[in-house]
């Protein structure tokens, strides 16, 4: 999973470029590119995603985010933050049009395409578009249920995830859609340490450094992160699966110097304790 932060306090790799690089050096890993869609030109983005997906043999997922937490990013690229919802929804519609084999034209409020398609097209004709939301608002749940291929849930508790899955299921059925078509993925930040209090402190300080602020609410770490011993972390991860997550994306929440060690501990101790395994190969890429 690669995030999208045009302006950030730490080095941050651009998602499309990174996926393109990794596509040429791997053969099984699925890539989730988190993209703040209102900041992107739909035509250019559709082209970049299609080529990355083609080169990776169908291993790309586009996770669209609304953005808005950092208005300066919008101002920096000449976009009015008030337009973000309209641009977000139109970007999804325009990209799906461009991946369609049938020629035609697209005319929206912000994007007009006189005609033409993207070639080469995505490996399987289209790329899954997930919505990266906390699922707080009625409108965001409605979008997930009606126009998305999946929900990438970040910064939610397991309880909130379960509630969101129930709400999305109801809305999808009301819309006449099979809820099983909507893949649910939870993003959980993990830090393994035998001292739970230290784990809370380290992760809170790490987020404060990342956001460039003096302090970070430790209650956020307690609520959303998997912290403590391997068994404690495993129990927290398992709670997301029990709440309805089909996949859990694990992000080591630690200073860079500890990253490799945390990955080893998570892989060797936490995942087995949680009864989880590394993600399988997508069916279309086998």
Question: Where are these predicted regions, by residue range?
Answer:
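Active-site-adjacent structural elements that line small-molecule/cofactor binding pockets in enzymes
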Residues: 1-286
């Amino acid at each position: 999973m690669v995030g999208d932060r045009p302006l950030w306090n730490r080095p941050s790799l651009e998602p499309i470029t990174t996926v393109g690089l990794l596509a040429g050096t791997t053969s099984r890993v699925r890539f989730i590119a988190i993209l703040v869609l209102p900041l992107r030109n739909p035509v250019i983005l559709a082209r970049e995603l299609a080529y990355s997906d083609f080169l990776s043999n169908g291993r790309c997922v586009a996770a669209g985010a609304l953005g808005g937490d950092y208005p300066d990013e919008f101002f920096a690229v000449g976009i009015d933050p008030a337009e973000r919802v309209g641009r977000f929804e139109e970007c999804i519609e325009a990209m799906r049009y461009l991946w369609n084999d049938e020629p035609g034209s697209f005319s929206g409020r912000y994007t007009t395409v006189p005609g033409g398609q993207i070639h080469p097209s995505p490996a399987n004709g289209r790329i899954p578009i997930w919505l990266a939301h906390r699922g707080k608002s009625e409108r965001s749940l409605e979008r997930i249920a009606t126009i998305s291929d999946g929900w990438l849930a970040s910064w939610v508790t397991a309880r909130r995830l379960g509630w969101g899955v129930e709400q999305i299921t109801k809305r999808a059925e009301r819309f006449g859609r099979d809820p099983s078509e909507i893949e649910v993925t939870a993003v959980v930040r993990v830090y393994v340490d035998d001292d739970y209090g230290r784990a809370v402190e380290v992760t809170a300080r790490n987020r404060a450094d990342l956001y460039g602020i003096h302090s970070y609410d430790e209650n956020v770490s307690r609520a959303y992160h998997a912290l403590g011993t391997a068994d404690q972390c495993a129990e927290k991860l398992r709670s997301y699966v029990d709440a309805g997550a089909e996949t859990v994306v694990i992000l080591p929440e630690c200073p860079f110097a500890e990253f490799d060690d945390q990955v080893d501990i998570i892989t060797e101790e936490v995942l087995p304790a949680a009864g989880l395994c590394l993600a399988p190969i997508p069916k279309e890429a086998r």
